[in-house]
Swiss-Prot record:
Domain of life: Eukaryota
Molecular-function annotations in GO: ubiquitin-modified protein reader activity
Transmembrane stretches, start-end: none
PROSITE patterns: ANK_REP_REGION, ANK_REPEAT, UIM
The protein, known as: Ankyrin repeat domain-containing protein 13A
Length: 588
């Protein structure tokens, strides 16, 4: 009895959630901290969701419980909701998550624009090069040149790589124009291909009043997609990151490496101990869905040095007092006693977890004489673009590390297992209007305009008269598991040229690829790539890109002898990949 009283006094709200006493919880929440953690690292909302107590979860969400917070194991509330298998729970949590994210986006834009206002005016180009050592992927990796103008509280960002859709890269000419003040902002998305402009004007207080929970109702197919797909959480682990100067020269004569990047001398650093950790949960899937997921696993992952650990469901510890969301019949006294060892027992549906870890090396080119400030001028813009772009979001996570001195004029970071992004800054203050050359080649340091004297022509921020304006269009883009969507798209790109039949099964929450054996896949891929060159078809859906045009022209001119030589080279690449596979298995 004393133990029960102790639990009630130390964790009164958690105990109400445990018992699903949602009516009393409603009364007690008015003066209590809804984000307090229990001894197992769960907030009230996490506890309610893990136990499947929908009524308590709704009460907590009405009281503004943080729906984005992670528990002690690094899972979000939405992850745990999907794990319950309850469509109502997923619907409720997803609706509040989207409402929260939209609110945060609206609140954050004016603050970022204020930071931009305080920074000196400038123009810069960011060249994005997506690269891969896997031949099938490297052929379809796109490039993009991002042009940025900043003048006062005005900002314009031009891009051509829009993202992923239907397993292909989407291209187009887009400009994002931001204008703002202390309490207002104007956002414009300019579609130069269709000559259409979507504008959104908002006063922060009025916009927040218009935003309602009813506007964020998820579609039923989105709930179904999550419940029939693995829960996948991909993160970049940089807690043990280390920066080391790259060496050049022969053994005994090695020196610190330096390179000239767009006219600026830069020191080259290797960034070590960067890991991509992918965690996959499948306990909410049916046996048929689990079987299909295992069969559809991408066999190319074995080539990538991925270390995988699988953790099955909890053992046969269930008792007659167990429930679906408390299968090992943990008592409140056991759960809330921080000194009590639960061993492998836990609340919630028994986890079926796979963890994949892959270490990467990133590379930095740091210049101490670069005319831009990373913190004052560049990071606020990356923060702003990260709200609508997955690769900008990954760059933001990386660029906020404690870098060596200087400006990162060139960065190479992993985006996904087989895909790297190389970002190069150049042509600083080399373009004051939108009509000038879009070349990415940087100008020498001595030719760059002084930052204090550089002025951007204000026509850059104006809309051409021939464009159609859709005023007050709602165009808030939510990043819905963007890294997982990117992961899925890249894996599908790997297999795009090797498919001989339609895909089957539902779309996944993340990186589920549809394939069979590695040998059969790679053989089909080689055959398809040869047909691609002969027939002028694009394997990765990049018919819009200039690279495809040049490759197509080259393919049309190839003779039969050159095609035979190409097939031989592909066979040699296959042998090299097989050798990498054997080495990776041996190292493990």
């Amino acid at each position: 009895m004393s133990s029960a009283r102790d639990t009630s006094s130390r964790f009164p709200l958690h105990l109400l959630v445990w018992n699903n006493d949602y009516e009393q919880l409603e009364k007690e929440l008015r003066d209590q901290n809804a984000e307090a953690l229990d001894p197992r690292g769960r907030t009230l909302l996490h506890l309610a969701v893990s136990l499947g107590h929908l009524e308590s979860a709704r009460v907590l969400l009405r009281h503004k419980a943080d729906v984005t917070k992670e528990n002690g194991q690094g899972w979000t509330v939405l992850h745990e909701a999907v794990s319950t298998g309850d469509p109502e729970m997923v619907y409720t949590v997803l609706q509040h998550r989207d409402y929260h994210n939209t609110s945060m986006a609206l609140e954050g834009v004016p603050e970022l624009l204020h930071k931009i206002l305080e920074a000196p005016d400038f123009y810069v180009q960011m060249k994005w090069e997506f690269t891969s050592w896997v031949p099938l992927v490297s052929r379809i990796c796109p490039n993009d040149v991002c042009r940025i103008w900043k003048s006062g509280a005005k900002l314009r960002v031009d891009i051509t790589l829009l993202g992923f859709e239907n397993m292909s890269w989407i291209r187009g000419r887009r400009s994002f124009i931001f204008k703002g003040g202390d309490n207002w902002a104007e956002l414009m998305e300019v579609n130069h291909d269709d000559r259409v402009v979507t504008t959104e004007h908002f006063d922060l207080s009025q916009e927040m009043e218009r935003l309602t929970l009813d506007l964020m109702k998820p579609k039923s197919r989105e709930v179904e997609r999550r419940l029939t797909s693995p829960v996948i959480n991909t993160s970049l682990d940089t807690k043990n990151v280390a920066f080391e100067r790259t060496k050049s020269g022969f053994w005994g004569w090695r020196t610190d490496k330096a390179e000239v990047v767009n006219g600026y001398e830069a020191k080259v650093y290797s960034v070590n101990n960067v890991s991509v950790i992918t965690r996959i949960r499948t306990e909410h899937l049916t046996e048929e869905e689990k079987k299909r997921y295992k069969e559809d696993r991408n066999p190319l992952e074995s080539l990538l040095g991925t270390v995988e650990h699988q953790f099955g469901a909890q053992g046969d510890l269930a008792t007659e007092c167990a429930t679906v969301n408390n299968p090992t019949a943990i008592t409140p006294d056991e759960y809330f006693d921080e000194d009590f060892d639960l061993k492998d027992r836990d609340i919630g549906r028994p986890k079926e977890l796979t963890i994949r870890t892959q270490k990467f090396k990133a590379t930095l080119w740091m210049c101490e004489e670069f005319p831009l400030s990373l913190v004052e001028q560049v990071i606020p813009i990356i923060d702003l673009m990260a709200r609508t772009s997955a690769h900008f979001a990954r760059l933001r996570d990386f660029i906020k590390l404690d870098f060596p001195p200087g400006f990162p004029v060139k960065i190479e970071i992993p985006l996904f297992h087989v895909l790297n992004a190389r970002i190069t800054f150049g042509n600083v203050n080399g373009c004051s209007t939108a009509d000038e050359s879009q070349g990415v080649e940087g100008t020498p340091a001595e030719a760059v305009s002084e930052a204090t004297n550089f002025e951007v022509d204000q026509s850059v921020f104006e809309i051409p008269e021939s464009y159609h304006i859709q005023d007050n269009g709602r165009n808030v883009h939510l990043q819905d598991e963007d890294y997982e969507i990117m992961q899925f798209a890249i894996q599908q790109s790997l297999l795009e040229s090797s498919r001989s039949q339609d895909l089957s099964g539902p779309a996944s929450n993340g990186g589920v690829s549809h394939t069979h054996s590695y040998e059969a896949q790679y053989e089909r891929a080689i055959q398809e790539s040869l047909l691609t060159n002969m027939e002028g078809r694009c394997p990765g859906g990049l018919s819009e890109s200039s690279r495809f045009d040049s490759d197509l022209q080259l393919a049309m001119e190839l003779s039969a002898k050159e095609l035979a030589e190409r097939e031989l080279r592909l066979q040699e690449e296959e042998a090299e990949l097989q050798q990498v596979l054997q080495l990776s298995l041996t190292e493990k």
